[in-house]
Amino acid sequence: MENPAPLTLRPLRLGELLDQAIRLYRRNFITFVGIVAMVYVPLMVLQIASTTLMTSSLDTLTSSPEQIFTNYAYWGGMLSSLVVAFLQFIFVQGIATGALTRAVADNYLGKTTSILGAYRGIGKSWLPLLGALLLVGLLSIVFAFWWIVPCIGWITGLGMLVVLLTAVSPMVAPVVVLEGQGVISSIRRAWSLVRRRFWPVLGYVFVLYIFSMLIVTGPGLIMNAVLAGALGVFEDPTSGLVIRTILQSLVQLISILLYYPLQMAAFTLIYFDLRVRTEGFDIALLTVDVSDQANIDQVMAAPAAVTNERLIAGSDVGNFAILTLAAVGIYIFFISIIMGGVFLLPSLIR
C-alpha cells in the first residue's frame, strides 16, 4: 500500500470526486477490500452452506410434498440463512461499514490506517450506526405509505423514498463514525448535508448506480445466462441447482468485495466535499496540526445545529415532486418502448 497523498482539500466537481475515489481505492486496495473480506467472506461461506442444505432437500419435497414439516434439512437451511442474514447486517452493514468509512477518511486526510487499525478506530460507533440504519428502514416503510396518500403523497412520496434510500442512507455512516452523531441526529444531519446540493448529489448517486450495474449486476446476469445453459445437462436438476447456487454466490462475493469499498469511498468523499463547500471544513483543517488525530477529531465534529432549520422546506417538497415526476416519466418512456417493440416486431417480421 502506498502512502496517502498530501492533504489538499477543495471543492470538487463530480468527475473529480469520482477520480479521487478511484485513486484512493487503488492506492489502498488491499486495505479496503480486506476490511470487508474479514467479516463478509466467513459469513458468505455460512450462507452458501445454508443455501446448499436447503436447496439439496428440494428433491425430496418435490417427490413427497407431505414431508415439508418433517424435512429438517430444509427448515434447518432456512433458519440458518435467516441467522446469517441477521449477522451480515450486524457485521457487514454495521461494523465493516464503519471500519471502512474510518479507513477511507483517514487515508483521504493523510493518515495511513491498517485493517485492524480501522476496526479499532470505530470504537462503539457501530451501535448507533446499526440503530440509524434500522430507523432508515422504518422511515422507508412510512414513506412508502405516504406515497399512496392522494395528491400530495402521489407527487412527493416516491421522491422522498428515493432520496432517503440512495442519498441519505449512505451518508449516515460518515456522519456517525466521523462526527459521533446519535441514531436520530445522524439521519437529520445526513439529510441536512444532502439537501444543500440536492441535484448534484443525486447526479453523483446515479453515476454510482451505473457503476454498480456494470460491476455487480452485469456479471451476475451474465453468469445466470451461462449457468442456465451449462447446468442444463445435469440429469439430476437438484444437483444442477445446488452447483448454480454456489457459483452465483461466489460471483456475488467477488463483486461485492470489489465494488463495496469503492462505493463507500465515493460516499465518504462527497461527504467531505459537502462539508468543504458549505462549512469551510478545509479552512478549519488548515488551522490545526493534522498529525495529531485529536485535532482532526475536533475539527470533524459537526458545527452546532441550526435551531430554526426546518426539516422539510417548500423547496424540498418541490424537489421531491420533480424527482417523482421524472421517475414516473422515465418509467412510462421505457414501458412505451417495450410495448411498442412487442406490437411492432411481429409486423416488421411479416
Regions found by a protein language model. Give the residues of each.
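Selective recognition of hydrophobic, aromatic-rich stretches within alpha-helical transmembrane segments
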Residues: 2-10, 73-111, 146-188, 198, ...
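Membrane-helix interface segments in multi-pass membrane proteins
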Residues: 43-89, 140-163, 216-260, 312-350
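Short membrane-interface loop/juxtamembrane segments of multi-pass integral membrane proteins
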Residues: 71, 122, 191-193
